[in-house]
């Protein structure tokens, strides 16, 4: 039944096609997580589908899960089958003769130590689980394969790794390659005595040749990353290739696939897709990263080959899903799976108004919120306005043709939507030897009283009064400036990986008041909060007034439209293994704060908050599991479920003319909740909820 396809996404849930990839349906929208790390179909009864939650590639934007799920009816209904504390699951293998036996490779969370890692097994269809392979609390199962001719033979790769907000370590004594010949009862670890590299190992990717299961490939991260091969079923190993062509960034990729009909044809899945026709001794590029016309996005994470027709393959990458029927000569991109990961969202005042936002690894875009055409909004109506990992977009309020767009590590451009022209305006320090620190998602904002005045955050606050052409520094270093957290050049562990994703001691939030000139709120990634009442001439550190964990990540600050002394602050600490939601409110310029959201109100950590600019009792909240609304000034919260999935809600904006709530999600693209005036009426008159019917003008 190859026309039935299931696709798991990093933070956009599970999708199903019954038409070979022509049409798609989201089938995992009501669960408590939208992050999918593994999918397995019971081939003897394809209506039985297993899903492991929590993506398995632990970059800085990683999403976690809450266990393993099972469906008996092709995804119409789901049952949680346990492993709730596993956080991230990367592989599921169903026994081909006895489907009650299922193996799960739990990679676990990189953000903290926990024992729910390693390889798990159930013998009763998920009712009970046994951990059958484990080394330590920082090591998880990065890969797991089964011999197709002998289901009692398993090969597992354990990976010792840890992530801090400011550093990543891959490799340690908990890593290793393990083989079991008795269905996981006992395991033997392979070592340098068997031909594997000496010393600590990092991430390992495994592949068994289906046509010749005695041939096994292992892509091993060590002091020198290399591809190893066994021709005796895993007893002895030999290094066959250590060139760059085998792959890169092992913490993020490390997947291999072998052609089911040809044991010498190997696909290495990484930034590119490289293929070997000689058993790994050499590779050629099947899909380069850029400069080709096949329309396939680079950065690949999932690869499937039809077991009977190796020309039919599917590729999952940072840009979506692609399908080929001719072994990579041509590709079809599935344009109807809306799983974009927005960091920020914005609107303009055109008619129809446009929605703007920056996406993880897919640039920054602009497109209409609605259209008067019968076909509705088409993908072609949207325009990429700048390249890179997209973050904040600030459309010019006076002329929507122009605006400012940010990308990773403090890059920013002036864009022209008509011509496509981009002009870089990244701030620099007047003393060239002074190094600026920009977060992966650096702070950027526009002054609400002077549209040509911009603010940008490094460790300093930068201000421009000429639209970004020139910049002045208007603050001291507002971070802790802790040197122990500024060693990003050493980040990566066995393989250096210094892309800027771990930049730390940086400014994340610059929030000017919309109703009082020169009032600025500042938040940093290392938990510092500052306030200026005079446009940056003087700064107050108000951090200790906030009852939050020391060093918590300041994700957002919202200055009130009703009271200049009032602001909302969103902090989260999941990067230090604390998922508690934290939203605070001050009404006295930061002298005191009250917590208005905690774990009794919502599920998961908080990401964004918005008080309605018209009705002060109406609040909206975005968390790791969705959208919440309060009608009573944040006293009580209700999850919004009608027409809206479980997903990360990263940012919120209100279009004032049309009273629309625009929602930027990290996994399900952007939504518009049309005309919230009825919600304002309910917040202003709570008794309306007791009326059986209420009409609104």
Language-model features and meaning:
Residues 1-697:
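Beta-propeller blade termini and top-face loops
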């Amino acid at each position: 039944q190859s026309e039935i396809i299931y696709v798991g996404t990093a933070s956009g849930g599970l999708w199903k096609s019954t038409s070979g990839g022509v049409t798609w349906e989201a089938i995992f929208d009501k669960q408590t997580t939208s992050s999918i790390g593994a999918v397995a179909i019971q081939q003897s009864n394809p209506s039985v589908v297993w899903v492991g939650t929590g993506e398995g590639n632990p970059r800085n934007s990683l999403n976690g899960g809450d266990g393993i799920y099972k469906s008996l009816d092709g995804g119409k209904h789901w049952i949680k089958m346990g492993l709730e504390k596993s956080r991230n699951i990367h592989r599921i293998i169903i026994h081909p003769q006895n489907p009650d036996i299922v193996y799960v490779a739990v990679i676990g969370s990189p953000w903290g130590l926990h024992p729910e890692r390693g390889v798990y097994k159930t013998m009763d269809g998920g009712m009970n689980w046994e951990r059958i392979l484990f080394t330590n609390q920082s090591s998880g199962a990065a890969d797991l394969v089964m011999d197709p001719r002998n289901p009692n033979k398993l090969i597992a790769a354990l990976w010792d790794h840890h992530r801090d907000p400011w550093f990543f370590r891959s490799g340690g004594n908990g890593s290793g390659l393990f083989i079991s010949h008795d269905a996981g009862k006992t395991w033997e670890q392979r070592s340098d005595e068997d031909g594997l590299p000496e010393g600590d190992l990092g991430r390992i990717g495994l592949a068994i040749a289906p046509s010749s299961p005695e041939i096994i490939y292992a892509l091993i991260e060590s002091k020198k990353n290399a591809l190893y091969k066994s021709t005796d079923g895993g007893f002895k190993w030999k290094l066959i290739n250590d060139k760059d062509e085998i792959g890169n960034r092992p913490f993020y990729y490390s997947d291999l696939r072998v052609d089911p009909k040809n044991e010498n044809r190997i696909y290495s899945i990484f930034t590119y897709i490289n293929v070997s026709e000689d058993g790994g001794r050499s590779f050629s590029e099947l899909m380069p990263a850029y400069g080709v016309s096949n329309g396939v996005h680079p950065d690949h994470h999932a690869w499937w080959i039809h077991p009977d027709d190796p020309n039919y393959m599917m590729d999952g990458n940072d840009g979506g899903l692609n399908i080929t029927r001719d072994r990579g000569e041509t590709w079809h991109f599935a344009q109807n799976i809306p799983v974009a990961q927005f960091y920020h969202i914005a609107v303009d005042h055109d008619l129809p108004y446009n929605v703007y936002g920056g996406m993880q690894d897919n640039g920054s875009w602009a497109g209409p919120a609605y259209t008067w055409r019968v076909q509705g909004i088409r993908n072609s109506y949207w325009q990429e306005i700048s390249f890179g990992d997209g973050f904040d977009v600030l459309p010019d309020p006076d002329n929507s043709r122009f605006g400012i767009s940010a990308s990773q590590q403090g890059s920013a451009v002036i864009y022209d939507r008509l011509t496509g022209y981009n002009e870089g305006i990244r701030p620099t320090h007047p003393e060239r030897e002074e190094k600026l620190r920009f977060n992966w998602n650096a702070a950027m904002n526009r002054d609400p009283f002077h549209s040509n005045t911009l603010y940008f955050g490094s460790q300093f606050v930068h201000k421009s009064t000429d639209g970004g052409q020139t910049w002045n520094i208007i603050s001291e270093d507002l971070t802790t400036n802790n040197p122990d957290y500024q060693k990003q050049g050493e980040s990566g562990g066995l393989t250096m990986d210094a892309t800027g994703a771990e930049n730390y001691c940086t400014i994340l939030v610059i929030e000017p008041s919309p109703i009082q000139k020169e009032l600025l709120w500042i938040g940093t990634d290392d938990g510092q909060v500052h306030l200026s009442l005079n446009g940056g001439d003087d700064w107050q550190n108000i951090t200790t007034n906030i009852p939050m964990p020391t060093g918590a990540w300041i994700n957002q600050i919202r200055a009130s439209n009703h009271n200049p002394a009032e602001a909302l602050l969103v902090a989260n600490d999941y990067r230090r293994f604390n998922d508690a939601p934290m939203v605070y409110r001050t009404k006295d310029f930061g002298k005191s704060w009250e917590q208005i959201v905690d774990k009794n109100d919502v599920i998961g950590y908080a990401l964004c908050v918005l008080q309605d600019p018209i009705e002060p009792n109406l609040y909206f909240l975005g968390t790791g599991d969705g959208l919440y609304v309060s009608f009573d000034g944040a006293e009580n919260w209700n999850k919004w479920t009608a027409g809206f999935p479980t997903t990360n809600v990263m940012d919120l904006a209100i279009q004032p003319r049309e009273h629309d709530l625009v929602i930027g999600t990290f996994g399900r693209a952007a939504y518009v909740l049309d005309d919230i005036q009825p919600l304002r009426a309910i917040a202003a008159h709570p008794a309306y909820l007791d009326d059986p019917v209420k009409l609104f003008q």
